[in-house]
């Protein structure tokens, strides 16, 4: 095992003065912990919140027009690819193992009526996503709150 603490990248969908944006962030406050019967492993406790866990399958060609995440939520593609487009015009495509944290609650509709983000599948296979939806509301304003 290396002595260097790992870093895990994620995309953060956040709100800046009513406009959704995406920032590439890093989780990097890992500490070595042990659990009975296992070798040491790296942990970064991202908070303690009640959460719901869901598995969703987005069919080929699926598009979720402009909407906000209902609650702050981690989204991890397990297979297939999907995209997230924010109000600032940025579009990010993600595949298996890439991580997004959706926290765009509180957007203000723009001149075209866009509010929050669009998302959808990419390619010719469904996107299987795991969602971990936090019961707590949005965290502090700004990107990268788990950095």
Regions found by a protein language model. Give the residues of each.
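Short acidic-glycine-tyrosine-enriched beta hairpin
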Residues: 88-106
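Glycine- and acidic-residue-biased ligand/ion/polar-headgroup-sensing regions
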Residues: 70-88
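A short hydrophobic beta-strand segment most commonly corresponding to one strand
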Residues: 101, 114-139
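Short, Lys/Arg- and Gly-enriched loop/turn segments at beta-strand edges
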Residues: 94, 107-119
């Amino acid at each position: 095992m290396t002595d260097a603490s790992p870093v895990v990248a994620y995309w953060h969908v956040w709100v800046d003065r009513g406009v959704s944006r995406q920032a590439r962030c890093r989780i990097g406050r890992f500490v070595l912990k042990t659990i009975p019967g296992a070798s040491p492993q790296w942990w970064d406790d991202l908070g303690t919140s009640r959460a719901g866990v869901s598995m969703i399958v987005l069919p080929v060609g699926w598009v979720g027009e402009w909407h906000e995440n209902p609650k702050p939520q981690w989204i991890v593609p397990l297979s297939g690819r999907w995209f997230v487009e924010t109000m600032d015009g940025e579009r990010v495509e993600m595949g298996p193992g890439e991580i997004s944290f959706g926290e765009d609650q509180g957007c203000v509709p723009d001149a075209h009526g866009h509010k929050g983000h669009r998302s959808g599948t990419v390619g010719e296979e469904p996107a299987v996503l795991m969602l971990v939806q936090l019961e707590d509301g949005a965290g502090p304003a700004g990107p990268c709150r788990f950095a």
